[in-house]
């Protein structure tokens, strides 16, 4: 029996960037987009084109340079936003306009100051306008989980009839419970005519620590797209963690018999790159990619792991791209060992650049016992030389997709298109837009 395919929609570059202190400029977004392409995500939400010139250029530049995945741009349900989004996306090989509009009574009354009838008409009209530019249109009813259920059905019916190809159900404030969220998805599948022709998506926030649990409940109820971020970064307490969702399905196919195109061995490099770009450390006990995720201190656990790793590990470090922990870097380590670990983290240097990093490494290694990955990333961040990623052409991925078990191929290299863009701040949006600019 063929396993159902789950579409992975990565919003690290849009919602993830809304995490305090995690803004990225155009160049950094482009680097991260190439890493997401290596990872094999299906959709990259590259930004919010109306928000700033930087976001516009990021969406435009990523659409020109990253050709395999769908490239999405966010837009409010108004003509100016939708037209600006299309202007940024029209050069992409596979563009998607993602339109959102708040639908809960509290948002309609206090933020938008419109009636339910006006909300319906605005949603319907915005989807029709977006479809006039683009065949792939996603609609999100912001704060869907606090929206009156009957009105949510009415709203989703309106946008499906207007031509939306994906309907995303956001738990915008992380309010719902897993069983409840699954019931919402099931309700829409039962009550909305034509919903079987539309992809149902989820977008869960982590305010109660339930973003991944809610996402998994929605998958079980019939959702077939998951919106998530690397390291779970995002507004307030963050978003559903991409690495946790992917590995939950991979480790428990008995409960979640679904496939994704994600090449899981690129999860750790993606996590480390994002941490380096945003200068935000990954918490040590973070599931899947934290420093302690495969660490064992208790004697009984250590004994079990030495005899058979499966006694206390439900996945291998290699399956998520964690470098070989047997290579310990210290003050006696040479350039070759340092260079190898940097390559495992996704960095490759010319000799002059490696020398500068190595000089700083030796100084640090004299001060601490072991130099770990987060120390190396800090050294790289502080080094004034260029620190390019390993070129895509150097990354070899089996056509069968190494260690994924999915059968969905991720290309070994992605064609680079000429890109001439000025670097702008990706978050120059203050005093230009309404307070409700950032949504979903």
Regions found by a protein language model. Give the residues of each.
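A mid-to-C-terminal "edge-of-domain" accessory segment
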Residues: 5-6, 10-12, 247, 253-425, ...
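Short, ordered loop/turn segments at secondary-structure junctions
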Residues: 13, 48-49, 74-77, 101-103, ...
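Structural signal for hydrophobic packing residues in well-ordered secondary-structure cores
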Residues: 37-40, 63-66, 70, 89, ...
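Short catalytic-loop micro-motif centered on adjacent basic/acidic residues
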Residues: 43-47, 70-73, 139-141, 201-203, ...
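Short hydrophobic alpha-helical segments enriched in small aliphatic residues
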Residues: 428-431
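Catalytic alpha/beta core domains of metabolic enzymes, predominantly
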Residues: 176, 183-307, 312
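Alpha/beta enzyme core
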Residues: 6-8, 18-43, 56-65, 79-200, ...
């Amino acid at each position: 029996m063929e396993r159902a395919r789950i579409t992975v929609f990565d919003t690290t570059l849009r919602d993830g960037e809304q995490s305090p202190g995690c803004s990225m400029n155009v160049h950094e977004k482009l680097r991260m987009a190439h890493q997401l392409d290596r990872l094999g995500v299906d959709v990259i939400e590259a930004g919010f084109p109306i928000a700033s010139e930087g976001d516009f250029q990021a969406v435009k530049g990523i659409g020109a340079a990253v050709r395999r995945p769908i490239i999405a741009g966010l837009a409010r349900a108004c003509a100016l936003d939708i037209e600006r989004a299309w202007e940024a996306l029209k050069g992409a090989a596979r563009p998607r306009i993602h339109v959102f509009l708040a639908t809960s009574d509290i948002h309609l009354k206090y933020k938008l100051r419109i009636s339910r009838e006006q909300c319906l008409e605005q949603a319907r009209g915005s989807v029709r306008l977006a479809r006039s530019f683009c065949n792939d249109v996603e609609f999100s009813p912001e704060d869907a989980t606090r929206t009156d259920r009957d009105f949510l059905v009415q709203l989703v019916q309106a946008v499906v009839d207007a031509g939306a190809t994906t309907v995303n159900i956001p738990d915008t404030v992380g309010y719902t419970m897993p069983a409840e969220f699954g019931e919402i998805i099931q309700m829409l599948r039962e009550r909305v005519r034509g919903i079987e022709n539309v992809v149902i998506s989820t977008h869960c926030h982590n305010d109660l620590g339930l973003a991944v649990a809610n996402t998994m409940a929605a998958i079980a109820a019939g959702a077939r797209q998951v919106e998530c971020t690397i390291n779970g970064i995002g507004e307030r307490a963050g978003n559903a963690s991409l690495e946790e969702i992917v590995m939950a399905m991979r480790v428990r196919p008995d409960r979640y018999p679904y496939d994704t195109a994600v090449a899981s061995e690129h999860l750790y490099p993606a996590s480390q790159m994002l941490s380096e770009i945003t200068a935000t450390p990954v918490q040590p006990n973070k599931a899947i990619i934290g420093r302690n995720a495969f660490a064992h201190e208790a004697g009984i656990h250590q004994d079990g792991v030495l005899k058979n790793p499966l006694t206390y590990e439900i996945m291998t470090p290699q399956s998520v791209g964690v470098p070989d922990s047997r290579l310990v870097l210290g003050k006696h380590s040479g350039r070759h060992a340092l260079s190898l670990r940097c390559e495992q983290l996704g960095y490759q240097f010319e000799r002059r650049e490696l020398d500068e990093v190595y000089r700083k490494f030796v100084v640090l290694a004299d001060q601490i016992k072991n130099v770990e990955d987060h120390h190396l990333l800090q050294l790289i961040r502080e080094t004034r030389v260029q620190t390019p990623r390993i070129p895509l052409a150097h990354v070899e991925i089996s056509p069968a997709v190494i260690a994924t078990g999915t059968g969905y191929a991720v290309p070994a290299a992605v064609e680079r298109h000429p890109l001439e863009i000025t670097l702008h701040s990706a978050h120059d949006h203050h005093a230009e837009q309404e307070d409700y600019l950032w949504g979903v």
